[in-house]
Amino acid sequence: MRAIIFSSLFPLVVLVLSGLSQAADVDPIFTPKADVVFPETVSVTYRQPVKMRDGVALSTHTYLPAAEGSFPALLVRDIYGNGSQPLRQRYARFATQNGYAFVYQVARGRYDSEGEWYPYVHETNDGEDTLDWIAAQPWSNGKVGMFGTSYLASVQWLAALSGHPALKAIAPAMSPGNYYRDVAYPGGAFSLLSRASWGIGLVGSRTNGSFPIDWISGIQHLPLKTLDESLGFRVQHFRDWLEHPSYDAYWEPLNLEARAPEMAVPALNIGGWYDVFLRSTIGSFSTMRKEAASDDARRGQRLVLGPWPHGWNASTTTGEVDFGDRSLINDEVMMLEWFDHYLKGQPLAKRAPVLLFVMGRNEWREEQEWPLARTVYQDWYLHANGTLSPEPPEADSGRLSYLYDPADPVPTLGGNIMRPELRGAFDQAPLDSRDDILRFLSKPLAEAMEITGPVSLRLFAATDGLDTDYMAKLIVVKATGEAYNLVDGVIRARYRNGFTTPQLLKPGEVYEYEIDRGATSYELAPGDRLRIDITSSNFPRLNRNPNTGAAFAETVEMRVARQSVFASKVHPSRVILPIIPKASTPANAP
């Protein structure tokens, strides 16, 4: 294992290998970013119409180094138009300064590109046609890399599906990979705030970066199927998402993790512990490493996980927690190493496949795999007296109950969400007065404990309704009293047996649910405690389950549900924690 130790005075790091440290070993990806400037002369072509196979022209900007000859190209395909201009200019300076052509293209149906925009569906063909165009240019040497974040990352994977030989490597940051699970329906519940503000909002801002709507109040509207019209638009893709609440043929083409065998491109996968697409970032890395179409692609997968929300590496603060200067990396150095190898044939820096940030300890660490091979999975049990411990319950019975009222849902406070004002780690104290949250608290830890890996919950519960939701949140309670969310998850009860065939409940019957709560890396300090919060709403992040069994997008009726959570020898509700043994070494460590 190569630990990365940070200076207490400067945002630099010294690598420690075999017990030795030297200033000469400072890793360049942890040094501050340098200013980038255009070379003295650079050739720029703005808004060139590049024709796709169906005749639709996409607005394309090209920046070329002043030197004679042909160059590898870095491509960004964007949907945010003029709002991306400052970043586009920095990308262009960075690329041309380092001997790359830079191509920036506005996606179909956005801003000054022709056609109609429907999220994701045109990006494979349009990406392939754009790669064709780049490879045919006299300034191109036929080698292309792609990079970008969020939708700008999605288009990279979708272009990779084309199998275009010019696409040599990609660097997707915070990209969805399973669009049903991570974009629209996590745990089967509709991702309301993100899908409404993004899916409807972008239509309203095709040519205007501002879209003045109070989303928090606006999405109170019912029925959800007419939410778009209530905001002044009719948005077909938003309606299609609502019309396909189960995983079906609509979503299958957009499960890119399942399509890994169709792709043969090395990828630098970048994610954040508080990013809405964290599971996809990890899933893409894992499936491509096992199932990609070529050995080069399987070996060429890298994973970087920092303490970031969506829109990575922009601030040291995530929610209410400041992780310090050490939490930022020099992404330009990292990208340059990556593309210089795959597009210019230079040696790739010797790095482990996984680089992750351990929160709490606030240290970067290299690992050989994900999940870590040395992980010890521990069951921590919920007890009827409100405690949480590694000891299983001894009583044959144990039940705790609460009322879930969809008209008075638990408000969203932190987590893996897009909205800047809500995402990240927050002290959960503002929710302490609510009686519709069950809380299970551990004793203070006697020694430090690291949790790194996927977290899940096995929950035994019953309701008096035909359908409902269960939410689970893993929280670290600091010795000073603050209670910060680490990971959370949801299961819509009708999808307890899978997301293809919903099954309503029998009121009063006890069911076992598995709640996937994503992943984290956090070291708890001595005196810290773990807490599990169980409830049935997280609004407006997720739509409110009306508890009626009706189609959620069509109904306006809601009912109060009585929820029961079981914690006993017969019904051992528990969280499964990935514990990293102290002073252990990773498998296959260099």
Locate each region found by the language model:
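Accessory cap/linker subdomain of secreted extracellular hydrolases
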Residues: 97, 158-262
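Alpha/beta-hydrolase fold nucleophile elbow
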Residues: 138-150
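N-terminal cap/lid segment of alpha/beta-hydrolase-fold proteins
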Residues: 32-67, 441-447
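Short beta-strand/loop motif that positions the catalytic acidic residue
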Residues: 263, 269-271
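Glycine-rich nucleophile elbow surrounding the catalytic serine of serine-hydrolase chemistry
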Residues: 149-158
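Active-site-adjacent alpha-helix of alpha/beta-hydrolase-fold enzymes
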Residues: 279-301
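Cap/lid segment of the alpha/beta-hydrolase catalytic domain
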Residues: 65-136, 184-186, 314-323, 466, ...
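Glycine/threonine-rich phosphate-binding loop and adjacent beta-strand/alpha-helix elements that clamp
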Residues: 24-32, 48-49, 296-297, 321-324, ...
